[in-house]
């Protein structure tokens, strides 16, 4: 499908219209990558997510300009949002080593123990406004926790989702850990929320 800029109505890109089959392929990839990502030492996951943050910072101006053209929002807002996206990855990278910290809260009558484990492949569905930053708001904590992700960005502003996926790959994050499927909510989005491999869904907006 074509995505158009709200600034002047110009066609920005031709975008793959993902469907249930594409979601299934992405979910399968996320499932296959889950065990090794889950079992990767937290310090290594932290290092990779910090590399993603660095890559976002290095490309912040390009991200901001693309966001402006794709969403129609002002550069002064999108420039700050791009930096915030890097900060999101840094914040959650620092949480990698705490991701499985449980609690031991004994009382006189009970001994209460909580544990944390990565739930598995998760879906992330993000909105059209400030799409890059809001995507990192859900993707970064999921990756830090040891989950793998299938991301379905809003069809109204899909351009920077591809850039995020490329930066994540360039940073050295293994294949299958982050998977992006474009498409419409009633097709790709619905298939994602109903897929049996996907253990949880994160919505933003």
Predicted regions and their residues:
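Histidine- and aromatic-rich ligand-binding microenvironments
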Residues: 2-5, 11-25, 172-177, 181
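Rossmann-like NAD(P) dinucleotide-binding subdomain of oxidoreductase/dehydrogenase enzymes
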Residues: 101-205
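Terminal low-complexity tails and localization/encapsulation signals of metabolic enzymes
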Residues: 1-15, 47-51, 99-125
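A generic short alpha-helical patch detector that favors 3-5-residue windows
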Residues: 1, 22-25, 55, 114, ...
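Glycine-rich loop-to-alpha-helix module at the N-terminal edge of alpha/beta enzyme cores
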Residues: 10-99, 109
